[in-house]
A protein has these predicted regions:
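Positively charged n-region of N-terminal signal peptides that target proteins for export
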Residues: 1-4
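Sec-dependent N-terminal signal peptides
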Residues: 6-9
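Conserved functional acidic sites
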Residues: 18-237
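C-terminal motif of bacterial Sec signal peptides marking the signal peptidase cleavage site
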Residues: 14-16
């Protein structure tokens, strides 16, 4: 769910006007840019509820990794990510969570936006359930269960030239990227384990970046609780 960063400068040295050599118009990467989102998670019945919060993400500047030009961004929850932008597109190469003192290289690059922006472009990355939970077990979140810590999600560019309205404004010429994963869960209606879909939708707009995200995680039994998470851009600098 974290994808937008920072690259190169206006000269050989790092300056205040950093930007990537291969700028992606759907991924503004200049140091100092920030995005604030309203985050709303609607949990399914029984015991439905809605959790609301805000998330701010900021580009922190160039921070080379493994001898290659790399750019760091940080969320106000303390998570950090390192990205590159080159002929392959924009992709993540390392991350650090809020409780860790060190960053970790990704085993494989994690594509955010491919260089080839066509509907024929397909790619995959690993993911975890963001908020799907168990009602009567600890820890409740599926993302902490070994079986669900490395779920393959297949992505594609589903639509282009989209118009998106969020609290930050109305944006045109946007890109819709959709990810689909199958996770094996107990399905109460069939009294069996079954692969069920987990769906991710992201809208990226020119010169702005990510403006909206939706994540669907299924409720398949009374002792599970899924729903829909939505992130909408409320301001950017």
């Amino acid at each position: 769910m974290r994808r937008i960063f920072i690259l190169l400068s206006c000269s050989v040295f790092i300056t205040a006007c950093e930007s990537p050599e291969r700028e992606n118009k759907f991924f503004p990467l200049a140091e100092g840019k920030s995005w604030t989102y309203a985050v709303e998670t609607e949990f399914d019945a029984p015991e439905p509820r809605t959790d609301k919060s805000k998330l701010t993400i900021k580009n922190m500047g160039r921070s080379d990794f493994d001898g290659k030009e790399t750019w760091r961004r940080r969320s106000d929850t303390g998570n950090e990510y390192w990205l590159r932008s080159d002929e392959k597109g924009v992709y993540r190469v390392a991350s650090k969570n809020a409780t860790s003192k060190t960053s970790y290289l990704d085993a494989n690059i994690r594509t955010v936006i491919p260089a080839n922006l066509t509907k024929d472009e397909k790619w995959a990355t690993s993911t975890v359930p963001y908020f799907l939970r168990r009602r009567n077990e600890w820890p409740p979140e599926f993302k902490y269960v070994d079986k669900y810590r490395d779920v393959t999600m297949n992505f594609a560019i589903e639509a282009m030239n989209q118009t998106v309205s969020v609290p930050a404004g109305k944006f045109t010429g946007c890109l819709l990227i959709v990810g689909r994963a199958e996770i094996n869960l107990w399905v109460e209606s069939g009294n069996t384990y079954k692969d069920v879909p987990m769906i991710n939708r992201e809208w990226y707009c020119p010169e702005v970046g990510l403006v909206q995200l939706e994540r669907e995680e299924p409720t398949t039994a009374r002792f599970f609780q899924g729903g829909v998470m939505r992130m909408k851009l409320i301001r950017f600098n």
